[in-house]
Amino acid sequence: MTRTEPNRSRSSNSDSDKNSGNVGGGRTTGMRVIVPLQGVVQGRGGLFLGSVIPCAFFYFLQFYLKRNRKNDESDNSGEQNSSASSSSSPNSGLPDPTRSQSAGHLTELTGLPRSLSRILLSPRNSGGAVSVSGRVNCVLKGGDSSPYYVGQKRVEDDPYDELGNPDGVIQLGLAQNNKLSLDDWVLENPKEAISDGLSISGIASYEPSDGLLELKMAVAGFMTEATKNSVTFDPSQLVLTSGASSAIEILSFCLADSGNAFLVPTPCSPGYDRDVKWRTGVDIIHVPCRSADNFNMSMVVLDRAFYQAKKRGVRIRGIIISNPSNPMGSLLSRENLYALLDFARERNIHIISNEIFAGSVHGEEGEFVSMAEIVDTEENIDRERVHIVYDLSKDLSFRGLRSAAIYSFNESVLSASRKLTTLSPVSSPTQHLLISAISNPKNVQRFVKTNRQRLQSIYTELVEGLKELGIECTRSNGGFYCWADMRGLISSYSEKGEIELWNKLLNIGKINVIPGSCCHCIEPGWFRICFSNLSERDVPVVMNRIRKVCETCKSQN
């Protein structure tokens, strides 16, 4: 009997099988390994199909992989497409030495075709949402949906102009004073305003981040004039920074730790939510004042808020006041200031006195008293807990030239503030321009006087016009605002009713005002109106638009 050679071809074996027709036991086992489907499809047909189907499947798989490999590798110029035979070579299972081996679990996949490795790897976009810090969530919490920001956006998109856009939105929500500025002085003194003391080397070199000494001296003189010479300010206790918001934030950082809080009587500036909380982690506890008390602070209510916070485990580090008030424009009396100092001493907390409108006090009624004057004249007051914020941008109508001052009696706070202003310094051109503008006492006196007269005139005309429409305002003696009582126009005594009226004022009347809820007023229906940017010709236009809203509200009610 002829033996079957191990190296014979498959065709020879087939011929031998046909001739001999004799299949031994060992040969049967080998055939079943080579032809796995013979046991499924019986008979002579099973032998044929069991051989053809695996081979066809194998070659179709090779064709599929070859085609996809060509598509994947066509992006890499300079590489040749792999042939179908290379996949069966002895070295085809080894990792490609040109591939990176540093990816840990990817090392085992580097020998696979790219089409297979991509299937085995997790999708590139399966890592979930990219997280950000909790501080960002705090910033986004206020959102652009607040009426405070929505109104500003409407003004930006459709600003009123007497000639160019008479149907645009009139801005009555932002503290700006475009109608009076130092433009006249700039025109009269172009050399001093633009080039006096300036050079490329002068403005491009490093300067003290807390302000030039020459500017501090000029600011101290301006603050003395703004307070009607009631107190003399020491330039060495001044730290200059880029705006009142930056000053409030720096003081919040210096006086409180994350999780601590400040007491803030309300209604208050909408900006405190941003200035105090966003980056410091310090919280605000609002202390409500009511119209029945003319929105005056009550020491009893302050004391109650302090102890309620203490019971909740919140440490109160200070109180923030505005004098003149934002949004009401009222002034704090000497008695109020003394009571606040006693309260701060008894509770061992700080006082931040926001006096950014000190140079914009108008009217004959009331007297502006700076906290610095109280501290300067009283010997038994703990002055290290008193800190004052002053804003040159507001009083000088240089709102784009961000410049403000921290005036403190606490050396630790001053030292830390000087370092923190590295993140928010006043620009060199702004400093040199301000030095030229406010170093002349006569120029400062003339500007402050003109500013106060103009504010008083516009305020009086606006309040009288509102009164004719049945809208009363609280008495304002300082700043750019009047606090208008529109409770008679709201559809329901609620925040919802207040926002509905605000929408009508914005969309029907096309005027942007700030609803009291943005100022944390607990009584709905009050609105902050900024009048400083109005001219005498603008006031009748505003009155006509508010009258239109009043008629709409009355017809609907």
UniProtKB/Swiss-Prot annotation:
SUPFAM superfamilies: PLP-dependent transferases. The keyword Protein transport does not apply. Expressed in roots. Residues 77-92 have a biased composition (Low complexity). Its EC number is 2.6.1.-. It is an enzyme of class 2 (transferase). GO terms for molecular function: pyridoxal phosphate binding; transaminase activity. Induction: By indole-3-acetic acid (IAA) and cycloheximide (CHX). Residues 1-29, 70-104 are annotated as: Disordered. Homodimer. One of its GO terms (biological process) is biosynthetic process. InterPro entries: Aminotransferase_I/II_large, Ethylene_sulfur-biosynth, PyrdxlP-dep_Trfase, PyrdxlP-dep_Trfase_major, PyrdxlP-dep_Trfase_small. Keywords: Aminotransferase, Pyridoxal phosphate, Transferase. Disulfide bonds: none annotated. The modification N6-(pyridoxal phosphate)lysine is found at K394. This is Probable aminotransferase ACS10. It comes from the Eukaryota. Belongs to the class-I pyridoxal-phosphate-dependent aminotransferase family. The keyword Transferase applies. Pfam families: Aminotran_1_2 (PF00155). Its cofactor is pyridoxal 5'-phosphate. Probable aminotransferase. Does not have 1-aminocyclopropane-1-carboxylate synthase (ACS) activity, suggesting that it is not involved in ethylene biosynthesis.
